[in-house]
Amino acid sequence: ENPDCKITSVSQNDNQNYCKCEKCAAVDEEEGSHAGSLLRFVNRVADEIKDDYPDVSIDTLAYQYTRKAPLITKPRDNVIIRLCSIECCFAHGLNDPDCEVNAAFKHDIIEWGKISKRLYIWDYVTDFTYYIPPFPNWRVLRENLEFFADNHAAGMYPEGNYNSVSGEFGELRAYLLARAMWDPYMSDDEMNSY
């Protein structure tokens, strides 16, 4: 129906209702993560389509209960892992040694980066709890972009203003993030020129 589609998603639902049958539970126990059963399924789909659709990739979320990388199964070359940072603290950088909330995600991105050739990040770039007031986390966003690049992230989706006219300077934040994604290591002077 859409021959130009190059990425299609096979992902979990946006909830905590994962399969608890005996077989899936055994796989997840062996893998040390609920991502084990999901990734084995996604890999089978990827294997089925690779000959007929060699330019198409399967995208799947590493999100909430599947965020932790599996111990055994690795994503196929035509599988994209989209690691979501929803549980993180967005006022502190992922490398901040004083932020215990971000420590688990930091570990997860490092582990996914070791096994995935195509790691993308779904990052949350504003404060959804207090959406409209100023949330000056630009320094954190810049640090995190560098951290993502250092840990083999090949793409990023920054979710910010999605449900109202705008949060704090939403359009400017989106523009600056777009510029920074082209070069996550650009200097502050370069960034300030935009």
Which residue stretches match the model-derived regions?
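Generic structural signal marking isolated hydrophobic packing positions
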Residues: 81, 193-194
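Carbohydrate-binding surfaces of carbohydrate-active enzymes
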Residues: 184, 189-193
